[in-house]
Each structure stands twice: as structure tokens, then as C-alpha cells.
């Protein structure tokens, strides 16, 4: 099985290839340079893996949430590549991707993901890894004010890992929440961590045709555009 993963939904730009169990990955912090970097990174990963695009079984893309511009860039480029090679596509949540990263780095199976969404809000989710290694919690994804996060936390108990830029942007996000929190060691999503999720989705037949690949913004785009200078 070969899966190519692409993510440009945040300040990071990353590409990874699952090549029959071997992973090759590249991750860069490159704000506002996604369009210049992503295709060269794809070419570098394919060359390093000795694979061509026509040998890929599916193309995974970071479907958001994240920067509107970044999410659109990633999906547009992924669609172009998938169309040219006639590949099925797999949308992967940026929040679930970070949860997978926390598991890879720390073994965490319960993860609170928060991405700074600007405008006084965070993109939020509570993910838990089940016995089959599948992340459950997509229904918890939302864009929330910090005080609403506090309300969500009061409904939880036990130990959780924290991931994402939302925690540094809002240091008091979990103030007096009563939970045991530890650092999941992930600030931004990486394509490498999309691959296990994408492989599960591919095995389950959860792919979409190129024309049906859609972003998940969690926020109304019109409301975002009312603020000048924001992506």
C-alpha cells in the first residue's frame, strides 16, 4: 500500500509517503510559502522513496480546520495531483492528525487538540484512541471561545495530552479544569501522522473522488473575511 499525504492547513507545510510500511516524511515551517514549497516537497519525497505518482494507491489531504488560505492551497494541489494520476482522495482532520502525533511521541491515547483560530477563538476537539487504534472524536470538533472550552473541559475527567497552538495562545485555557494534563509535544499537524489515519480510512473504503474532496473550516468564511489582514 502506498499513500501520499499533503498538509498545508497551518503555518507548517508537510508531505509524507507510506510506502508498504516505510514512511518518508518532510516537514517545514513556511508561513505564506506553501504554494512555492509543496510541489517540490512532493517531488523530493517521491524521489527519495523511488516511487512515482502513478504507483500511489491514494492521496490524503489535510482537510482542516486551519487557515482558510492554507486549507484551500492543500486541497487544490492535492486535487490536481490526484486528478492527473486518477487517485482516490482521503480527507484527514488536522486535529486528529495532531492526536496521532501525540500518540507517536508520548503514547497518549486521550488528546485535547486546540489550534489558535484567531479572532479570539480556537479550533477544538477531544480525541480518544480506541482498542483498534482508531481515533474517535470527530463529532467534538468545533470553533470555540476560550470560556466555552472551559465548559467542555468540566465534562471530562482523568488524564489528557494537550496539542496545538491554542494552548500557547491561551495559557489559561484549562485553568482550574480539574484534569491531569501533560504536553503531547505537538504544536502543528504533520503529514507523517496523517498516514496511519489515512490507511485505516483506505482499508475501510472511506475515500472520495477528486470532485468531492471538501475542506472542513468549522467557521463561516464570510465572518473571517470581515477582518482585514487575516487569512
Swiss-Prot record:
Keyword Nucleotide-binding tagged:
no
Mention any Pfam family matching this sequence.
TsaD
- GO terms (BP aspect): tRNA threonylcarbamoyladenosine modification
UniProt keyword annotations, A-Z: Cytoplasm, tRNA processing
Q: Name one GO cellular component term.
A: cytosol
Q: Which SUPFAM superfamilies match?
A: Actin-like ATPase domain (SSF53067)
Places the protein is found: Cytoplasm
Q: Which domain of life is it from?
A: Bacteria
Function field: Required for the formation of a threonylcarbamoyl group on adenosine at position 37 (t(6)A37) in tRNAs that read codons beginning with adenine. Is involved in the transfer of the threonylcarbamoyl moiety of threonylcarbamoyl-AMP (TC-AMP) to the N6 group of A37, together with TsaD and TsaE; this reaction does not require ATP in vitro. TsaB seems to play an indirect role in the t(6)A biosynthesis pathway, possibly in regulating the core enzymatic function of TsaD. Neither binds polyphosphates nor a wide range of nucleotides on its own. Does not show O-sialoglycoprotein endopeptidase activity. Has been identified as the first Gram-negative bacterial RPF (Resuscitation-Promoting Factor) capable of reviving VNC (viable but non-culturable) cells when added externally, but the million-fold lower activity as compared to Gram-positive bacterial RPFs may indicate a lack of physiological relevance.
Q: Which family does it belong to?
A: Belongs to the KAE1 / TsaD family. TsaB subfamily.
Query: What is the name attached to this protein's record?
Result: tRNA threonylcarbamoyladenosine biosynthesis protein TsaB
Question: Which lineage ranks, top first, belong to the organism behind this chain?
Answer: Bacteria, Pseudomonadati, Pseudomonadota, Gammaproteobacteria, Enterobacterales
Amino acid at each position: 500500500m502506498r499513500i501520499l499525504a499533503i498538509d498545508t492547513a497551518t503555518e507548517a507545510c508537510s508531505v509524507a509517503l507510506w510506502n508498504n510500511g516505510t514512511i518518508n516524511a518532510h516537514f517545514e515551517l513556511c508561513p505564506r510559502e506553501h504554494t512555492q514549497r509543496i510541489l517540490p516537497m512532493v517531488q523530493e519525497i517521491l524521489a527519495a522513496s523511488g516511487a512515482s505518482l502513478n504507483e500511489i494507491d491514494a492521496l490524503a489531504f489535510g482537510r482542516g480546520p486551519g487557515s482558510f488560505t492554507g486549507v484551500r492551497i492543500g486541497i487544490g494541489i492535492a486535487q490536481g495531483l490526484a486528478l492527473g494520476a486518477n487517485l482516490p482522495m482521503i480527507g484527514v482532520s488536522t486535529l486528529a492528525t495532531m492526536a496521532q502525533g501525540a500518540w507517536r511521541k508520548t503514547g497518549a491515547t486521550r488528546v485535547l487538540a486546540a489550534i489558535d483560530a484567531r479572532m479570539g477563538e480556537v479550533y477544538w476537539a477531544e480525541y480518544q484512541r480506541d482498542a483498534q487504534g482508531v481515533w474517535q472524536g470527530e463529532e467534538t470538533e468545533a470553533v470555540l471561545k476560550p470560556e466555552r472550552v472551559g465548559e467542555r473541559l468540566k465534562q471530562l475527567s482523568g488524564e489528557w495530552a494537550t496539542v496545538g497552538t491554542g494552548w500557547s495562545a491561551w495559557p489559561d485555557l484549562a485553568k482550574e479544569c480539574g484534569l491531569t494534563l501533560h504536553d503531547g509535544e505537538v504544536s502543528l499537524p504533520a503529514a507523517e501522522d496523517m498516514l496511519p489515519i489515512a490507511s485505516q480510512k483506505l482499508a475501510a473504503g472511506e475515500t472520495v473522488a477528486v470532485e468531492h474532496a471538501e475542506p472542513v473550516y468549522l467557521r463561516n468564511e464570510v465572518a473571517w473575511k470581515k477582518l482585514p489582514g487575516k487569512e
